[in-house]
Amino acid sequence: MQSVGQQILIRTKGRSLWWLSKCGWNICCTVIFHFVIYLSTIIFCLLTQSKILSSVDVELMNVMFTTNRATQVSEIGILPFSLLLLPIAISIGINLFQMTLSLFIKPIFSFLFISLFMLSSAYYMSPFWIGNYAMPIRYNLMHTNGMLISNGIIVSILLITASIIIGLISFRYYDIINRD
């Protein structure tokens, strides 16, 4: 923790409040970043006069992803919800986990670990690699043996909660003076 962080910690009059405010800041930044991405997409669609739809064209999905999911049209309604919120929830969970991991190892190693973990999600489809839940092409609606959206929601909630609680407990005993 650098001098600015130490000064803010002293002014907040408590480690728990400081950790929770840092988690809140992390969550707000993640939501804002995703909002900017979504807003950029909408602006691009408006500039190129592309249609912005809140539904999924099942025929196009079958052609693009070589699936045969025309019989599951009722399940497709959850896809737009998942496209918007599940990647945000997974990002929040990963960001909070990286921040918590930085309490135990140096931040650069925490970043490297999370980067390799997320990179592995691009190459291996498994519920263990939680980055798969942030990729709609890996959902069970698109892929025969794909990820369940409900599992992604549960995993993201558990990761967010565990990261906040473990970080809160660990930061109480964290030596802020003798660390890099």
At which residue positions do the language-model features occur?
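Transmembrane alpha-helices and adjacent helix-loop boundaries
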Residues: 1, 30-34, 108
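Helix-loop-helix units of permease transmembrane domains in multi-pass membrane transporters
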Residues: 1-28
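Transmembrane alpha-helix boundary/anchor motif
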Residues: 35, 39, 96, 129, ...
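Secretory targeting signals
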Residues: 20-103, 138-157
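Junction motif at the cytosolic side of a transmembrane helix
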Residues: 160-180
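Juxtamembrane "helix-exit" motif on the non-cytosolic side of transmembrane helices
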Residues: 125-143
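Central hydrophobic cores of alpha-helical transmembrane segments
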Residues: 106-122
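Membrane-interface helix-boundary motifs at transmembrane edges
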Residues: 99-107, 172-177
